[in-house]
């Protein structure tokens, strides 16, 4: 799970514009992933 989150955060940081996060959110219904990228990253401590 941690590896998955790190992978998603990496793809967001590298400019996927949150597409991966949106896909995960709609597939798995994970709360907190439909926020803007910066908010998601800061939520996990990647400020």
From Swiss-Prot:
Q: Which of UniProt's keywords are assigned here?
A: Antibiotic, Antimicrobial, Bacteriocin, Isopeptide bond, Secreted
Q: Where in the cell is it found?
A: Secreted
- The record's disulfide annotation reads none
Q: Which residues form a coiled coil?
A: none
| UniProt entry tagged with the keyword Secreted | yes
Q: Where is this site: Basic bulky residue that acts as a plug entrapping the tail within the macrocyclic ring?
A: 43
In its UniProt record, which GO terms are filed under biological process?
defense response to bacterium; killing of cells of another organism
Domain description: Is composed of a ring composed by 9 residues, and a tail of 10 residues. The peptide is threaded when the C-terminal tail is inserted throught the isopeptide-bonded ring.
Quote the function comment for this protein: Peptide antibiotic that functions through inhibition of the bacterial DNA-dependent RNA polymerase (RNAP). Inhibits transcription by binding in RNAP secondary channel, where it sterically blocks the folding of the trigger loop, which is essential for efficient catalysis. In contrast to MccJ25, does not restrict access of nucleotide substrates to the catalytic center and shows a non-competitive mode of inhibition. Shows activity against closely related Gram-negative Burkholderia and Pseudomonas strains. Is not active against Gram-positive bacteria.
What protein name does the entry list? Capistruin
Instruction: Give the species.
Output: Burkholderia thailandensis (strain ATCC 700388 / DSM 13276 / CCUG 48851 / CIP 106301 / E264)
Which gene is annotated as encoding this protein in its UniProt record? CapA
């Amino acid at each position: 799970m941690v590896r998955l989150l790190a992978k998603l955060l990496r793809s967001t940081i590298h400019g996927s514009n949150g597409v991966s996060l949106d896909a995960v959110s709609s597939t798995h219904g994970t709360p907190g992933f439909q926020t803007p990228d910066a908010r998601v990253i800061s939520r996990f401590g990647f400020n």
